[in-house]
């Protein structure tokens, strides 16, 4: 079994080491709960009839909901990671309809400091 990149010391990391997370299936309850928590009741997420006529043809998860779940799927050792300082280059490549199972794949990109 490969150890998660976030749990290894820098000198034990191998370039390109990959880890794939467990899955998380997006449910209707997830969309409703996220809408209630954030106040984002856009009909693409909340209105079945409206979403059926949209370019996606159905309700889809909020991008930030998917991103939040993706972060929760990361294999992070709480003794090593103290805080999230930022996220670079987040791109939402395709819609995530209800019933979709998401997974996160992480890999090591080693950039030694000067």
Spans of features found by a protein language model:
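HotDog/MaoC-like acyl-thioester-processing domains
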Residues: 1-15, 20, 92, 96-114
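Catalytic strand-loop segment that frames the active site of acyl-thioester-processing enzymes
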Residues: 1-61
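Hydrophobic beta-strand-centered segment that forms part of the acyl-chain substrate-binding groove
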Residues: 52-111
